A protein has these predicted regions:
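Small-residue-biased structural context
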Residues: 1-180
């Protein structure tokens, strides 16, 4: 039987969970694009307020956890495991990834203020430039991780390391593991 909804992978597949987060980020970025065309025509109507609320919720709650998953668990595990070409690539990519996380957080603070006003119905203004910059940063960042970091993790991390990564991600979200 097929389901009507996409289900998220379990924490026993931590790299798949991170990819699922990227897919959700892409959906939120698409919502921001839709808001850019919706607001000039309809203003901060109920649809716009709900869309702003959804984007706010994702980028203030889920996205920071995703960054912590990478910074506190995934990237350190890769650093301790990688050798030769993988170690050289990580040495090159890690500073860039960390810098991108900081830049995305800073750019988010600009958008967050605008989206809160839309959510409250007090403004229908959303900066196209801010949206484009934020989206471009995230899309580039996710491509980098999906092209280099995720395949490396799948290739070099042991089952035990994957299990620890998944358990840390689950705990970070306050999800109690199944007793089974």
């Amino acid at each position: 039987m097929t389901t009507l909804f996409d289900s998220a992978p379990g924490f026993d597949q931590p790299i798949a969970v991170l990819k699922h987060c990227h897919d959700r980020i892409r959906k939120q970025l698409a919502t921001l694009d839709k808001l850019l065309t919706h607001l000039p025509v309809h203003g901060a109507d109920q649809d716009a307020r709900q869309a702003a609320q959804a984007v706010l919720k994702y980028f203030t709650q889920a996205a920071p956890l995703h960054h912590e998953d990478e910074e506190m668990d995934l990237l350190p595990a890769l650093e301790t495991t990688a050798t030769q070409e993988d170690a050289a690539l990580l040495k090159q990519l890690l500073p860039e990834i960390m810098k991108q996380h900081l830049q995305m957080t800073a750019q988010w603070s600009n958008l967050e203020k605008q989206l809160k006003q839309i959510q409250e119905g007090s403004s229908a203004q959303l900066s196209t430039l801010d949206i484009r910059h934020f989206s471009d940063m995230y899309l580039h960042h996710m491509e980098l991780e999906e092209t280099h970091i995720a395949p490396m993790a799948k290739r070099i991390l042991s089952d035990a390391q994957m299990q620890r990564l998944g358990a840390a991600m689950q705990a970070r979200r306050g999800i109690v593991p199944d007793a089974s």
